[in-house]
A protein has these predicted regions:
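Acidic/His- and Gly-rich active-site-bordering loop/insert found
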Residues: 2-97, 101-126
Length: 126
């Protein structure tokens, strides 16, 4: 079993690359199809089950298989209209001035570190 720190060291380069890619390809709310695809690719690669929710949302669950509390974590995908931003999309002027690309990176880091470290077996609930 890896420590959480070892797991993070291993996955961070990929998570940072994903976050930077999302930063450079901003999408407005309910139009985050590319961002959603990137998140799903990361979840699939880690073998984390997920399902579609809302229009462009995803619900992923790490289940310990033991009874216990459920802890909900949420992240947002959308960018906001920001005229003149160097990374604003040409068609919608969307840019990640809100930091949601970073939220997604943190969330994926948590999910993947828990999964990759084997820490889930020491937890209960979902």
């Amino acid at each position: 079993m890896k420590s959480v720190h070892e797991a993070l060291d291993q996955i961070l380069p990929e998570i940072i690359a994903m976050s930077e890619d999302i930063y450079c390809h901003p999408e407005l709310g309910f139009k985050e199809f590319r961002t959603r695809k990137k998140a799903i690719e990361a979840l699939d690669k880690a073998g984390i089950p997920h399902e579609d929710v809302a229009y462009t949302g995803i619900r992923a669950v790490l289940d310990s298989g033991k009874p216990g509390p459920n802890i909900g974590l949420i992240t947002e995908f959308d960018a906001v209209p920001t005229f003149g931003h160097p990374y604003a999309s040409e068609d919608s002027c969307a840019a990640h001035t809100c930091g949601h690309y970073g939220q997604l990176g943190v969330m994926m880091s948590l999910f993947l570190a828990i999964r990759e470290s084997g820490m889930l077996k020491d937890l209960c609930g979902k």
